[in-house]
């Protein structure tokens, strides 16, 4: 997770340095002004699009070579057909017939869906949001890295504090409540502040700060969702992985409201997500029956 977030911090800065130029702010303003004829505007937009092609080709080649390396590397085989004796014992005296008989597992998969969606929204939309609040794009390009930096801090504190000083369940409750509070800050904060050398609306920094509680939520949801599954653990884990589709779906929901109303109103999508996460952290993971 830490290596992943380090890459996430560095990569936007590298791509921005490769793609954005010092005079692009004037170029963007000119394109949005409406002063250009259609042919000139399209030519400028095409030039901007062309900049991303080579970096993505290079990235694709790197991923291809990595995949080939993994394919021919000597890695131990994982025998998924071996049934753990403990799993069998866990289910020996239960009438559970499928994963659908574990309500807390289904609720956990939904929790992961909402959680990963809020992660992507907080990271991927912040540049456009900062720009809509009057910040130059060349200045706003660093904000995804700030969000991921907050996530890194959360990971490190989690390693130090959990479970020695704080239980994973209490950490989950605290992080979901903090995420909810920060989400209200994003949609309600209406004052400027200066942080990290940037003077901007406080809601932008609240969006950055969401990276911190989001760091520990996934690790809290997972064990609470698969405990006691026994022989259904592998299938249950697969269901939780399917919850990662929230990465793709919730940003579209945000985009719908952002297009219909405003970028800031779009962030109201975060509120019900975190309300549900608070519910799961406090109550949902304890529900053992649908009745």
Show the residue positions of the predicted features.
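Juxtamembrane intracellular "pre-TM" segments in multi-pass secondary transporters
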Residues: 78-108
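C-terminal transmembrane helical hairpin of 12-TM major facilitator-type secondary transporters
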Residues: 168-221
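Glycine-rich segments within core transmembrane alpha-helices of 12-TM secondary carriers
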Residues: 1-28, 36, 237-251
């Amino acid at each position: 997770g830490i290596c992943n977030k380090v890459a996430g911090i560095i990569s936007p800065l590298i791509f921005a340095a490769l793609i954005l130029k010092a005079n692009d702010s004037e170029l963007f303003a000119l394109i949005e002004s409406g002063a250009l004829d259609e042919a000139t505007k399209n030519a400028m937009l095409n030039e901007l699009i062309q900049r991303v092609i080579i970096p993505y080709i290079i990235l694709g080649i790197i991923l291809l070579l990595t995949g080939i390396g993994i394919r021919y590397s000597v890695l131990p085989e994982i025998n998924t057909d071996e049934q753990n004796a403990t799993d069998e014992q866990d289910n020996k005296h239960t009438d559970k017939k499928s994963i659908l008989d574990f309500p807390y597992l289904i609720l956990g998969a939904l929790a992961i869906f909402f959680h990963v969606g809020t992660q992507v929204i907080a990271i991927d939309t912040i540049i456009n949001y900062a720009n809509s609040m009057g910040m130059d794009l060349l200045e706003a390009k660093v904000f995804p890295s700030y969000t991921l930096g907050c996530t890194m801090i959360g990971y490190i504190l989690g390693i130090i504090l959990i479970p020695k000083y704080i239980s994973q369940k209490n950490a989950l409750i605290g992080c979901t409540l903090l995420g909810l509070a920060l989400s209200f800050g994003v949609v309600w904060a209406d004052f400027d502040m200066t942080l990290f050398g940037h003077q901007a609306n406080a809601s932008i920094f609240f969006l950055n700060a969401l990276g911190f509680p989001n760091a520990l939520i996934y690790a809290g949801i997972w064990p609470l969702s698969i405990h006691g599954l026994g022989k259904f653990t592998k299938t249950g884990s697969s269901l939780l992985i399917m919850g990662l589709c929230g990465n793709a779906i919730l940003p579209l929901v945000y985009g719908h409201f952002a297009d219909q109303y405003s970028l800031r109103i779009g962030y109201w999508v975060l509120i019900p997500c975190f309300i549900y996460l608070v519910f799961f952290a406090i109550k949902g993971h304890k529900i053992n029956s649908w009745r």
